[in-house]
UniProtKB/Swiss-Prot annotation:
It catalyses: adenosine(37) in tRNA(Ala) + H2O + H(+) = inosine(37) in tRNA(Ala) + NH4(+). Its EC number is 3.5.4.34. Belongs to the ADAT1 family. SMART domains: ADEAMc. Residues 226-267, 369-386 have a biased composition (Low complexity). The lineage of its organism: Eukaryota, Amoebozoa, Evosea, Eumycetozoa, Dictyostelia. It comes from Dictyostelium discoideum. The active site is at E85. PROSITE patterns: A_DEAMIN_EDITASE. This is tRNA-specific adenosine deaminase 1. Zn(2+) binds at H83, C154, C315. Specifically deaminates adenosine-37 to inosine in tRNA-Ala.
Length: 545
């Protein structure tokens, strides 16, 4: 049976991910009592004509914080975004580099995911890696990648309506609690900035550090518990029907119906699930009115910050971009034949099928359905023409699944525990893992390895293995091996690898991936015009020659 037809597939992916976290990862970096975090995994599934097997967790990430603009580095030596989804994606990229290196170094190496083929400078296929042969990497037939995250990604996916009558607290009191929490954070900001290095040395002090998003959503998640469990059950049924029919039109109808419910039948709903992610410049701003009109939907957002604003796009926006550009990124696109797309995404807490479909797929379609003036203007602000068919490849076949199985360190589970009378906080650490056994813990508030202090902050040894600089080093290792295998004079005249080998500038090497950036420019032109990009000053770092 295909995984698409298995009604228990999402629960199997969830359990496989949880078991891996609990049994295969060491304790280092995991939340302590009273702490919560977000978990994301990328799982390999291998399918044949009659069955499938959930094979391996290829990468994993935990975390829910990111750096403010003033904390970014122009050396590529810190992790800017430590949300679990992004840690998982960067860990997967590290896995890709390692696998390709192994394939290049040994013709006997059997990759768990990739095939390697060789061709000459005229793109003619060759049987082996003799001189003059260039490698092309592709995913093995029947192999697919499946993303799991234990709660809805921040940003557009997490905005959906609900009925106030299902909530255990008075709405006005809840709003007051949210405001009080935000004020307390702002009052303590200066003190915490001074103590930042001291805090990272002691795990127990991490509970005193919490960003605006964490504080705000603790109240909201607790309120939305009952309502969203109902949403999960309903949407599980919808998803199973969609899978059995394998019909994307059902997804479109679900998304359109949800938009109509929000905007045309406001009496059905009292409020909207809120996100701390802020709209980017150029997008319509949130109206912040009472009830369902608080947020705009379908717009680009940045992750919330604490006084120091961030320039990291929301996870909803980043995953949507993966549905066009792939999860391999620009540098790996030099070697990998086609974009690497996710086949499915399974989400736990705060699941709402329509909002997730809208955030990841619907708003990228040629004519996304909008039913209010404000939402329509949002769509046009991110699109040069809503009637123009985007000339880019969209992963519209992405399957969206839900699961009611909760992660043991989820915020929703922690807040619903009636025996927990202590204040809950988000973990200040982020775990990254990539297959087969590379495990690392970083400090989310400074983007460096666990154990970093004031004295060793700038030490090379304290850089994360998945920071830009270190992934760039892996990229150049690939380039050097390919160049050495491709040393005849004719190929050196025509080979872009030789050109790349002469460049040690991160920004320049990224932008040499012409196919990737052609797709990226199309995406910006037609849909994501206001996407925030890093200043070139932050990406002009170089490797030692």
């Amino acid at each position: 049976m295909s995984w698409k037809l298995d009604k228990q597939f999402s629960d199997k992916i969830c359990n496989f991910s949880h078991d891996f976290f609990n049994k295969k990862l060491i304790k280092k970096g995991k939340p302590i009592s009273g702490e919560w975090t977000v978990l994301a995994t990328l799982v390999l599934v291998v399918e044949n004509t009659s069955s499938y097997e959930i094979k391996q967790v290829l990468s994993l990430g935990t975390g829910n914080r990111c750096l403010g603009k003033s904390s970014l580095s122009n050396q590529g030596d810190v992790l800017n975004d430590s949300h679990a989804e992004i840690i998982c994606k960067r860990s997967f990229q590290k896995f890709c580099y390692n696998e390709i290196l192994n394939l290049l170094q040994s013709k006997y190496y059997n990759s768990i995911l990739f095939n390697i083929e060789y061709h000459d400078s005229n793109n003619n296929n060759k049987d082996n890696d003799n001189n003059g042969s260039l490698p092309t990497i592709s995913i093995k037939k029947g192999h697919s990648l499946h993303f799991y995250v234990n709660q809805t990604p921040c940003g557009d996916c997490s905005i959906f309506p609900f009925k106030k009558e299902t909530q255990p607290e008075n709405f006005i009191e809840k709003e007051k609690l949210e405001k009080d929490g935000k004020d307390k954070i702002e009052n303590h900001e200066k003190k915490e900035q001074k103590d930042i290095i001291k805090q990272v040395d002691k795990d127990k002090d991490e509970e005193n550090y919490e960003d605006e998003e964490s504080k705000r959503k603790l109240k909201k998640v607790k309120d939305d518990n009952n309502n969203n469990n109902n949403n999960n059950n309903n949407n599980n049924n919808n998803n199973n029907n969609n899978n059995n029919n394998n019909n994307n039109n059902n997804n479109n109808n679900n998304n359109n119906n949800n938009n109509n419910n929000i905007n045309n039948n406001n009496n059905q709903y009292d409020d909207i699930q809120r996100t701390g992610a802020k709209t980017v410049f150029g997008e319509p701003e949130d109206k912040k009115l009472i009830g369902v009109d608080y947020h705009q939907i379908g717009v680009l957002r940045v992750k919330p910050g604490r006084g120091d604003p961030t320039v990291s796009m929301s996870c909803s926006d980043k995953i949507a971009r993966w549905n066009v550009l792939g999860i391999q990124g620009s540098l790996l696109s030099h070697f990998i034949k086609e974009q690497i797309f996710l086949s499915s995404i399974t989400i736990g807490d705060l699941f709402n099928h329509s909002s997730i479909y809208r955030g990841l797929i619907g708003r990228l379609l040629p004519n996304p359905t909008t039913t209010t003036t404000e939402t329509s203007s949002s769509s046009s602000s991110s699109s040069s023409s809503s009637n123009t068919i985007p000339n880019f490849k969209l992963n519209s076949d992405l399957e969206i699944f839900s699961t009611n199985i909760q992660f043991q360190f989820s915020k929703l589970l922690l807040e619903s525990d009636q025996q927990n009378n202590n204040k809950s906080t988000s973990s200040g650490l982020a775990i990254s893992f990539c297959y087969p056994n590379q495990h690392e813990v970083t400090i989310a508030i400074n983007g460096k390895k666990m154990g970093t202090n004031q004295k060793n902050f700038n030490a090379i040894s304290q850089r994360s293995s998945i920071c830009k600089f270190n992934l760039f080093k892996l990229f150049h290792q690939l380039v050097l091996i390919i160049k050495n295998k491709n040393s005849n004079e004719e190929n050196e005249k025509n080979n872009q690898i030789v050109l790349i080998d002469s460049l040690f500038n991160y920004y320049e090497c990224k932008h040499l991936s012409k196919k990737y950036y052609q797709e990226y420019e199309k995406l910006k032109e037609f849909k994501f015009k206001n996407w925030l990009t890093n200043s070139s000053d932050l990406e002009n770092f170089v490797l030692d020659n």
